[in-house]
Every structure is written in C-alpha cells, then in structure tokens.
C-alpha cells in the first residue's frame, strides 16, 4: 500500500504525516521551532529552523512507518501563508529571517498606500485589502531595509517565495522555483481573476518580476526531491496554503460549504464556486484551490489570535501549564462576571482590520481570577468566529440554505467546552470530523490526486466522517446578552485608536 506524505509547515511547528491510500494515518512527527520578536509587533522565523524541522519530521515519520522513499507515492506541502522568505538565487541563503504573517512592521507603509487611494484598485485585482498581513509589503520592506537587497533583486540575484516555495526550492536542490495559486493569491501581487502576477501591483510595491515563482495548479507535478534527503527521490505533487488545504481536507467542494480552522489564528473559508464574490463586510476574496487550470474561489475571514490566546495564558500569565487545562478551568469561572478579552495582540483582523490597536480585558473585578481569564480567552475565539460568520451570511446570497453548519478543525477543536460555546454563540451546529488533521490531509489529497492514489473530489467527499456534532443549547436571551457585551468591548478597544 503506497503512502502519501504531507508536509505541514506551521507557524510554531513543522509536521509530517504519512497517509495510507485509504486516507488513514500511518505515522506522524512534529517539532516546534523558536519564534523571534525583535520589536513590538514584529514576528520572525529563521528559515534554517523551518527547513531543519521540516526534514527532521519527514525522516521521523518515515522511520515510524518503516517507509522508504520508494514506498511514498508523492509529497504534498501545506504551509503558513503570507510568511515571506527572500534568498540568494544561487546559494539558497536567505538574506534575512522570514517575516511572519503576524508581523505588523509595514503598518505605516500600508496606511500611506491607503491614504493615496490605492486600496480599491488593489482589492479589485487581488480580493485582499492593503494590510501588513499579506506578503507584498513584507517583500518591499526587505528590499528597502536589507543592505544591497534591492540592487541584487533588480540584477536577478534574489528569489522570493512563501514558505511552500522556499521548501520546494530546497527539496529540489534549487531546481524548481514555483508555488500554487492559493499561496500566490495571498501576496498582494497576484491577480485572482487573470490567475497571473500583476505588473501594476509589482510596480506599486517595487518588486522585480524576476524574483517571482511560477504559479501552478494546487495538484500538479512540482518537481522531485533530491535523493540524498530521504534515501531516494520522491515526487512533489501538491501544494496549498494551510487554510485552503484545510478546506480541501474538510471536503468543502460544494459552493456554500464553510470550514473554520483553529490554530495560532482562526480562519474561516466559504466556498463560492467558480465566481469570486466581492465582500461588502470586509472579508477577503481568495482562491480556494485550482485544479485542471480552473480556479475555485472563497470568501475568507482571518483572525490573528485564537490558539495563541491560550499560549498567552500559559506562557505570558502562567495561568495554566498545558493547553488541555483551559476548558476545565474556564468551566469553574464565576457566571456572575462578564469578562471579555479582545485579543488584539498584533492588531485586529477581519472584519475590523485595524493593525494599530492592541489587546485589552474588559469587565475585570476584584474577584476576577485564573478561571475567568481562561473563560474570556476561549470565548474570545468564539466571539471572533461569530463576527466572521455574520459577515459571511451577509455576503453570501444563499446564506440561509447553505451556511447552516460549520465544519471545524485544528488543535482547539479538541476542547469540547470551546466547541459547545461556539455552537451556542453561532446558534448553529458545529461539526468536528473524525480526522482532525485536515490541513495535512488536504495537502496529501492534492498530491495523491495527482499521483493517482486518491479518488476524484466527490468520492473523496463521500468518505468524510463526523466525529461529533455540537448543537446550540444556549437561550436566545443569554446569547444576545453575551454578544452585545462583546460588541461593546470591541467598540471600546477601537475607540483607543488614535490613528497614525
């Protein structure tokens, strides 16, 4: 039975999972790597840490499964999106640490671009807004702030890529510089209607075309790994950004289906089919996947802080020692207290898009303690999801019929407390699948589809299995009171923004 290996390169760790041809998991491995915070609002990774942990986990997973390179039909790659690496075109040496998607150092630059009235043009082409979140302004920062970088780029000596592209380059020994349409669509440089890099956007941000990778289908032959990495060459046949990969892993192939992934951040995608839908509620229009040269689009809401709120409880406050303690602790909170955490640690994402505000707690009393803080942290994820859910229902014309169930995945979905509270606040069922490694599964599926190991999308969708459906159990009065309190807290935080 052949294996398909998924590389899942995330914000805080790298993972590798071997899937059998029946979509069951044979083995997995994971390694965390350091985060670097050189200034307020700045987040960086060492590219060598990304590479080293990726290769180490691939080898570890293969060892656990007793698999050789010959046993693996294909590799699929999924990755933290928007994070930028720029490297020397010959040596492969990065010119700077990777600038992570959470990084806000280009906020002032983005504000200037908006003030010049450029956002409508950018949004019309990319489906995105002008925000530090996306890759384009990060690349511009590197070219302008690393000594000699712009001159080298203009001479064709530098390459740019999101993390998938960087890993593909390294895996193929520098032979392949390519990405897929989902990752390209997150750069601010890619026209999602034409399916190509856009010269007007490249000129706007000062990015030479020679730096850019080829854009391919999400399921395609991207290249082959060099033999010395895994004891033999393995073909690489699938790439998708992490949230799009999770959409595929959740089998959201039908327009109107919606999934929400809970990792470091929270990201909800609504499949809108072959037509890109323009949001009137500050959601993003993005490429869900591209198969056979045909793009499928999605509306996306991006939240910057979800699981990282729990990390803050553990690492910042010392309230818990392990993430699994959060739900039971929250269950002990004083119901008479209404404590709200607005976790804008790096600004606010959809649907507010404010890079300047920072997190705040509201409703603290003398009796507020660890249980109330845990409660507020978990509920903040649910409230933020509600904001995305409401925006999607407003933007999607068939909302009443289509977006009635939310498929969830990611580490936080292991918390029954959080998932039940999510169903309560959405007033809608929340479905948790049997296979919760949906991001890796999506990458594996794309690779296995190209390699002929996995079936066509509809047959794959028929194999999706439900683990548990969380049904709303909160009274309408309680739900409305809690949502109103959240809205007041958000307004209170936004009122602290004095602009640039």
From Swiss-Prot:
Entry-linked InterPro entries: ATPase_NBD, Carb_kinase_FGGY, Carb_kinase_FGGY_CS, FGGY_C, FGGY_N, Glycerol_kin
Record-level Gene Ontology MF annotations: ATP binding; glycerol kinase activity
GO biological process terms, semicolon-separated: glycerol catabolic process; glycerol metabolic process; glycerol-3-phosphate metabolic process
Binding site for ADP: 11, 15, 264, 307, 411
The UniProt record lists the keyword Glycoprotein: no
SUPFAM superfamilies hit by this protein: Actin-like ATPase domain (SSF53067)
Catalytic activity: glycerol + ATP = sn-glycerol 3-phosphate + ADP + H(+)
CDD domains: FGGY_EcGK_like
Record's keyword terms, sorted: ATP-binding, Glycerol metabolism, Kinase, Nucleotide-binding, Transferase
EC number: 2.7.1.30
Signal peptide: none
Residues involved in glycerol binding: 81-82, 133, 242-243
Means of activity regulation: Inhibited by fructose 1,6-bisphosphate (FBP).
A Pfam family recorded for this sequence: FGGY_C
Chain positions recorded as ATP binding sites: 11-13, 264, 307, 311, 411
GO cellular component term of the entry, any: cytosol
Matches recorded under PANTHER family: GLYCEROL KINASE, SUGAR KINASE
Descriptive protein name: Glycerol kinase
């Amino acid at each position: 039975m052949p294996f398909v290996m998924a590389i899942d390169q995330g914000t805080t760790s790298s993972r590798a999972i071997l899937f059998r041809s029946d979509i069951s998991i044979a083995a997995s491995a994971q390694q965390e790597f350091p985060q670097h915070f050189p200034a307020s609002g700045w987040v960086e990774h060492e590219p060598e840490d990304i590479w080293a942990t990726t290769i180490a986990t691939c080898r570890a997973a293969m060892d656990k499964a007793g698999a050789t390179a010959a046993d693996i039909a294909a590799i699929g790659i999924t990755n933290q999106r928007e994070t930028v690496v720029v490297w020397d075109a010959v040596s492969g040496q990065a010119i700077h640490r990777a600038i992570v998607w959470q990084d806000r150092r280009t906020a002032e630059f983005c504000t200037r671009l908006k003030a010049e009235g450029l956002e409508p043009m950018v949004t019309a082409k990319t489906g995105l807004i002008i925000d530090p979140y996306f890759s384009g302004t990060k690349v511009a920062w590197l070219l302008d702030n690393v000594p000699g970088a712009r001159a080298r780029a203009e001479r064709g000596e530098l390459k740019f890529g999101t993390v998938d592209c960087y890993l593909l380059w390294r895996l193929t020994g520098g032979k392949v510089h390519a990405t897929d349409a989902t990752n390209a669509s997150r750069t601010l440089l890619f026209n999602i209607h034409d399916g190509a890099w856009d010269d007007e956007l490249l000129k706007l941000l000062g990015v030479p075309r020679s730096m850019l990778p080829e854009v391919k289908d999400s399921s395609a032959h991207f290249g082959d790994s060099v033999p010395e990495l895994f004891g033999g060459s393995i073909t690489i046949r699938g790439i998708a950004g992490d949230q799009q990969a999770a959409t595929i892993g959740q089998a959201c192939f039908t327009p109107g289906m919606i999934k929400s992934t809970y990792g470091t951040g929270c990201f909800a995608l609504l499949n809108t089919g072959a037509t890109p839908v323009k949001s009137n509620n500050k959601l993003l229009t993005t490429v869900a996947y591209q198969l056979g040269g045909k793009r499928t689009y999605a509306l996306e809401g991006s939240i910057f802080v979800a699981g990282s709120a729990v990390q803050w409880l553990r690492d910042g406050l010392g309230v818990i020692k392990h993430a699994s303690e959060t739900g039971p602790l929250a269950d002990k909170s004083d119901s008479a207290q209404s404590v709200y955490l607005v976790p804008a640690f790096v600004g606010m994402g959809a649907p507010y898009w404010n890079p300047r505000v920072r997190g705040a707690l509201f409703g603290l009393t003398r009796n507020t303690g660890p249980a109330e803080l845990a409660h507020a942290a978990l509920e903040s994820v649910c409230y933020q999801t509600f904001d995305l859910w409401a925006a999607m229902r407003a933007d999607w014309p068939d909302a009443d019929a289509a977006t009635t169930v939310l498929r969830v995945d990611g580490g936080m979905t292991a918390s029954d407390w959080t998932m039940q509270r999510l169903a309560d606040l959405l007033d809608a069922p929340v479905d948790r699948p049997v296979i919760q490694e949906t991001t890796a599964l999506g990458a594996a599926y794309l690779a296995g589809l190209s390699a002929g190991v996995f079936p066509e999308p509809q047959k794959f969708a028929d194999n999706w299995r439900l683990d548990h459906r969380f049904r709303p159990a909160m009274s309408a009065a309680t739900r409305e009171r809690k949502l109103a309190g959240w809205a007041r807290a958000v307004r209170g935080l936004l009122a602290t923004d004095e602009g640039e």
